[in-house]
From Swiss-Prot:
Catalyzes the attachment of tyrosine to tRNA(Tyr) in a two-step reaction: tyrosine is first activated by ATP to form Tyr-AMP and then transferred to the acceptor end of tRNA(Tyr). It comes from the Bacteria. Keywords: Aminoacyl-tRNA synthetase, ATP-binding, Cytoplasm, Ligase, Nucleotide-binding, Protein biosynthesis, RNA-binding. GO terms for cellular component: cytosol. It catalyses: tRNA(Tyr) + L-tyrosine + ATP = L-tyrosyl-tRNA(Tyr) + AMP + diphosphate + H(+). Its EC number is 6.1.1.1. ATP binds at K233. A motif ('KMSKS' region) lies at residues 230-234. Homodimer. This is Tyrosine--tRNA ligase. One of its GO terms (molecular function) is RNA binding. A motif ('HIGH' region) lies at residues 38-47.
Length: 424
């Protein structure tokens, strides 16, 4: 491989790029940027591709700029949207920017000498831009005809809801971002998802018209799933990078559960593994799909990258708990997260004080057993587990000593029939 573009090609991450970009990257190290929309107080897994694109360029010796959209976030990007988005308050956008800046920082190297990463906020220049300056310095150079020809605008113009002037102007603001970074930081390249191509080329055109110089664009494909459903969404919503919004366990499980048809592509997109390593994992999947070897490697690589080694270890311990693994090292929060979807009952903590409650009564109250005699037979048959530890004693009583952090107890019948007791 001679340039970063060769790596992006074999990973399937080069959807479209400006003419001459290969030659530019062979000649020199460049500064590039990708913008991040602060529409929430956390990035989600859909942002991993742009984050890793910046990181991959940096590993090839280029200088990445992660641009938080503190200014453009006040407007809202219409690209890929079928209707107008509600405007966020200035205070909410500012708070979101601060939150995502911390996440952006963990993927890039800010102490890499002459190609150290930069973290900028376009509110610094957009909020100082007067309406008169905007119309003279930006609006004058891009015609309405040019803007209407862009897919992001044309598709909205054809819809019932149309597009407001506010969102229509977003393209000009993003173009100004590129021109500003070109002038002040020598940034020659903007990257983004394929739905950003129209906005990126508008910036290239603005730079050409205002400075007579050439800038470049590059877009990667939007992430898709083989079954046609939206990537990055689960039944409970988006998969966030913030562990408070999506626990490392559920983050790990998302990647572990990807389809065989997608796992090879995602290994290329979201990990640093080599082509040879990925091809070997794909061959194992083809021969023995039930082992889920590739999915496990994908889950390990991405969880470690986002949450760290310690969180990965806990996520794997938690994953084993569903298959009878030990709960000894897990917290009550971990257990509640793992067993969120299993049947549960709530009991007063005082019911387990002192001698507590008989295991037989607990099994009946949970519904694991239909009667006391049914519970007795299950215990005597060795099929009952307390916190994944087998209990064959029909005289066993549940007390607070059995609880995890005084908050919950996990009962199990057989291999997979779980029930959670929550204590209040």
């Amino acid at each position: 491989m001679t340039t970063i573009l060769d790596e992006l090609r074999w990973r399937g991450l080069l959807y479209e790029s400006s003419d001459g970009l290969d030659d530019l990257l062979e000649r020199e190290r460049v500064t590039l940027y990708i913008g991040f929309d602060p529409s929430a107080d956390s990035l989600h897994i859909g942002h991993l591709l742009p984050l890793l694109t910046l990181a991959r360029f940096q590993r090839w010796g280029h200088t990445p700029i992660a641009l938080a959209g503190g200014g453009t976030g006040l407007i809202g990007d219409p690209s890929g949207k079928t209707q107008e988005r509600p405007l966020l308050s200035k205070e909410q956008v500012a708070a979101n920017v601060e939150a995502i800046k911390r996440q952006l920082a963990q993927f890039l190297d800010f102490n890499a000498g002459d190609h150290s990463a930069m973290l900028l906020n376009n509110a610094e220049w957009l909020t100082r831009l007067s309406l008169m300056d905007f119309l003279r310095d930006v609006g004058k150079h891009l015609t309405v005809n040019y803007m209407l020809a862009k897919d992001s605008v044309r598709s909205r113009m054809m819809s019932e809801t149309g597009i407001s002037f506010t969102e229509f102007s977003y393209m000009l603001l993003q173009a100004y971002d590129f021109a500003y970074l070109f002038e002040h930081y020598g940034c020659k390249l903007q990257a983004g998802g394929s739905d950003q191509w129209g906005n990126i080329t508008a910036g290239i055109e603005l730079i050409r018209r205002t400075s007579g110089q050439k800038a470049y664009g590059l877009v990667y494909p939007l992430v898709t799933k083989a079954d046609g459903t939206k990537f990055g969404k689960t039944e409970s919503g988006a998969v966030w990078l913030d562990p408070k919004r999506t626990s490392p366990y559920r983050f790990y499980q998302f990647w572990y559960n990807v389809d065989d048809a997608d796992v090879g592509k995602y290994l290329r997109y979201f990990t640093w593994l080599s082509a040879a390593e990925i091809e070997e994992l794909e061959q194992i999947t083809a021969r023995q799909p039930e082992r889920r070897t590739a999915q496990q490697r994908l889950a390990r690589e991405v969880t470690r990258m986002v949450h760290g080694e310690a969180a990965l270890a806990r996520a794997e311990e938690a994953s084993q708990a569903l298959f009878g693994g030990s709960l000894a090292s897990l917290s009550a929060d971990d257990v509640a997260d793992i067993f969120e979807d299993v049947p549960s009952i709530t009991l007063p903590r005082q019911d387990l004080e002192g001698d507590g409650m008989s295991l037989i009564d607990a099994l009946v109250r949970c519904g694991i057993a239909t009667s006391k005699s049914d519970a007795r037979r299950a215990i005597e048959g060795g099929g009952i587990y307390i916190n994944n530890v087998q209990s064959a004693d029909v005289g066993r009583r549940l007390t607070l000593h059995d609880s995890i952090d005084g908050q919950c107890i996990v009962l199990r019948k057989g291999r997979r029939h779980y029930h959670l007791i929550r204590l209040v």
